[in-house]
Amino acid sequence: MSPIAFLLPFLLQMVLSTNVSTTSNNGVTEIRLDNKIVDLTKATVLERSKCCTVYRPVEDSSCIIVSSKHGASMVNCHGSVSISTSGKLSAEEMAEFNSLTQKYSG
């Protein structure tokens, strides 16, 4: 087997991977994909519930973002999942966020 064939899966993963960063402070969440701040006002809404919204950002259309009203977020990009919470979530909001996170993290 040639060295290139052996390294190809690793090289593809490096090329296709997205650097994900989420931070929350006092209920305000900032999400970055490859060091660019995600603008959720431009993202496609995939699902909306009472407490949470699921987005597909224009910055990387292969990513999924679940965002709650009070500062919880989950970002799934190329199988890499990042979760951040801040602020106070009610039991209902936390249950809804957890349900959507499970649905969209796989």
Curated annotation (Swiss-Prot):
<dbReference type="GO" id="GO:0005576">
    <property type="term" value="C:extracellular region"/>
</dbReference>
<feature type="signal peptide">
    <location>
        <begin position="1"/>
        <end position="17"/>
    </location>
</feature>
<keyword id="KW-0732">Signal</keyword>
<keyword id="KW-1015">Disulfide bond</keyword>
<protein>
    <recommendedName>
        <fullName>Venom family 8-like peptide Pr8a</fullName>
    </recommendedName>
</protein>
<keyword id="KW-0964">Secreted</keyword>
